[in-house]
Amino acid sequence: TLFRSNAVLGLATGSTPVGLYKQLIEWYNKGDLDFSQITSVNLDEYKGLSGDNDQSYRYFMNTNLFDHVNIDKTRTYVPNGLEEDSDKACADYNEIIRSVGGIDIQLLGIGGNGHIGFNEPGEAFEKETHCVDLTESTIKANARFFESMDEVPKQAYTMGIKNIMAAKKILLVASGSAKADALYKSL
């Protein structure tokens, strides 16, 4: 099997993991996977967006995976984008990760410049979940999902490198030639 029946999966969003999520759904539909005891913690969420906003990462996960498998949505965690107190939002999310026993498998995509989650290259390894000001390049890259660049949130909550590296296993997925240099430099 791919993972224990009660595994804690760290999940990512963006275009890179969509193919993997489609494959997981296919295996679920064939009866090869059961998500009923799975817990998930997502890598990040835009600050200021509610989970029902169609640009939120909660919405993305519902649309691309959770709505298609038998996962208990009360055990699917995404940082609270509506929490205005950044310190509280981050502390709460770190506590969730600890309370579920840590992450068994962390799925990551890698950005063209080498970012994982919203952690830019060179981010401190000791950081846990934190609020980041999105870089201009990240805002531009994500603008394709919004009506205009002005609508792209300027901040996000993201797991830190410390959270990610604490996972028992990490699965880094990259697709397309635009990611080749970033992948090469990360190894």
Task: Tell where the protein language model's regions lie, with residue ranges.
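Glycine-rich beta-strand-to-loop/alpha-helix junction loops that act as flexible
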Residues: L11-T16, L108-G112, S175
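Class I SAM-dependent methyltransferase SAM-binding "motif I" and its flanking Rossmann-like core
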Residues: G117-I161
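Glycine-rich phosphate-binding loop
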Residues: G101-K127
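Ligand-binding beta-strand-loop-alpha-helix segment within the catalytic cores
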Residues: L33-I105
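Glycine-rich N-terminal segment of FAD-binding domains in flavoprotein oxidoreductases
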Residues: S5-N29
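ATP/nucleoside-binding phosphotransfer catalytic cores, i.e., glycine-rich phosphate-binding loops
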Residues: K162, A166-L187
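A glycine- and small-aliphatic-rich helix-loop capping segment at beta-alpha/alpha-beta transitions
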Residues: Q23-D34, Y57-Y59, P121-C131
